[in-house]
Amino acid sequence: MESLWKLSYLLEPASLALILTAVSVAYASASRALDHGREMERNLDFSEASITLDRSQALMIPLASSCSLLLMFYLFSSVSHLVTAFTAVASAMALFFCLSPYVNCVRSRLGVGDPFVSRCCSKPFTRLQGLLVAICVGTVVAWLVSGHWLLNNLLGISICIAFVSHVRLPNIKICALLLVCLFVYDVFWVFFSERFFGANVMVSVATQKASNPVHTVANKLSLPGLQLITKKLELPVKLVFPRSLMGGLAPGSSPGDYMMLGLGDMAIPGMLLALVLSFDHRKIKDMSVSQDMPPSKQRKYVWYALTGYGVGLVTALAAGILSQSPQPALLYLVPSTLGPVMYMSWLRNELWELWEGSRPIINDKAHLLEV
């Protein structure tokens, strides 16, 4: 009975905010990936084309991630300034990518002119884009100075959406391979790394803070306002929500405690959602072209995957609460998202079509490798 009572912690404001944000970001990532692909096809502009993973790349991702994890575990204090600087640049670029469609939409609806100013990286650069760059850079600077968790989450969400939009899966075959490999990766580094390295590598890396290069420079130059600049930063590679959010605080928790979810636990399922959302829209388009085929009223695959993601995320949080120990989220998210999609496609006799995927658009800019 006590265990069931502990599950009420899932109704804390921090837990609910984490769940709702993660589900929304996973769907937003898939939707933005679909729109980005359409935009590239419509404009025949592949200078920002996506990378479509092949089998060898899917196998290399867990290995590369493991190497990065060990590097951060042993050498983080030595490279934290460099990592923070790289993350700041990537965050600004990702935020620009995410906000650009909204700026263009507002401009077109208001009929506001946006005169050409110059060329940047062989692309036209307008005044509104310049203003947006300033806003994005200002947001990153505000994060570097304050380290506020809301800004951290905003930048992390932007990175997640940009990643899913630019790194694609060609079919369920490669998707299943990637998810199973990352399933093993997550389980090993959370549950078994302590036996080999003397500490839980995943938890250690996820919870350590980076040194703030802005604070270091301000300190060396004895600049005024040094006390306003945070010394340590949570990098935007995870969502963080304070347990004291809106007055909620679980027994045994301190006001400084946070609930965390790694970006990979949103981005990897988001790649699956992007794949099935693209498949859903292609099926609808094929049916609209075919005159003798009635429009399908079947539920889209993306909703099965998204529902499974929500269920898997709640299950992962519940397991963490009941066990009082960190849980590998992909242990729950991989079967809860991939399973329903494969089962429903098998029932509809579309598993082979999803398994092999549609032929991608070949261009000299995109990195497309056929399996």
Swiss-Prot record:
InterPro entries: Peptidase_A22B_SPP, Preselin/SPP
Record topological domains on the Lumenal side: 1-6, 76-80, 147-149, 193-258, 323-326
EC code: 3.4.23.-
Keywords: Endosome, Hydrolase, Membrane, Protease, Transmembrane, Transmembrane helix
Residue spans crossing the bilayer: 7-27, 58-75, 81-103, 124-146, 150-167, 172-192, 259-279, 302-322, 327-347
Subcellular location: Endosome membrane
GO terms (BP aspect): membrane protein proteolysis; signal peptide processing
Membrane in keyword set: yes
Active-site residue numbers: 186, 265
Motif mapping: PAL: 328-330
Coiled-coil ranges (or none): none
Pfam (any one): Peptidase_A22B
Membrane topology: Multi-pass membrane protein
Topology Cytoplasmic: residue spans: 28-57, 104-123, 168-171, 280-301, 348-371
Molecular functions (GO terms): aspartic endopeptidase activity, intramembrane cleaving
UniProt keyword Protease present: yes
GO cellular component: cytoplasmic side of endoplasmic reticulum membrane; endosome membrane; Golgi-associated vesicle membrane; lumenal side of endoplasmic reticulum membrane
Class of the enzyme per the UniProt entry, highest EC level: hydrolase
Role played: Intramembrane-cleaving aspartic protease (I-CLiP) that cleaves type II membrane signal peptides in the hydrophobic plane of the membrane.
Record remark on domains: The first transmembrane domain may act as a type I signal anchor. The PAL motif is required for normal active site conformation.
Family classification: Belongs to the peptidase A22B family.
Identification of the protein by name: Signal peptide peptidase-like 1
